[in-house]
């Protein structure tokens, strides 16, 4: 239903606002009405480290806070990068001593990020409409790049929020 409606929205020149007003209860309506800050995991529940933190320590933090990624921040709290299982796999291909390396050597620098007022559909588009799809987005304050939290694709596609 929502996929067909989305195609009609595009074909007839409806804006996202028009669709939200006319179909607020569907999945797409939910994604257009909710903002990232309403469903993200706050920074205090995210695995976080600094560029010099060893990969082994980052992995332990990711085990304690299992969201699929760790955010890497500078001393001032600004986002330096993100470390995912993909970074781990690529790193292990090149370096069997990866666990003792600083995460800054293998993290993704300048990751795609969301801001707290972004609607969920825009965030989903950032993750899905790219050559290499991603499953998590750091959430940052746009003006300062301070880490605010983490958003997973899974969180966006949940049928309903409690």
Where on the chain are the PLM-derived regions?
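Nucleotide-binding motor/catalytic cores of P-loop/tubulin-like NTPases across gene-expression machines
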Residues: 81, 85, 96-100, 120
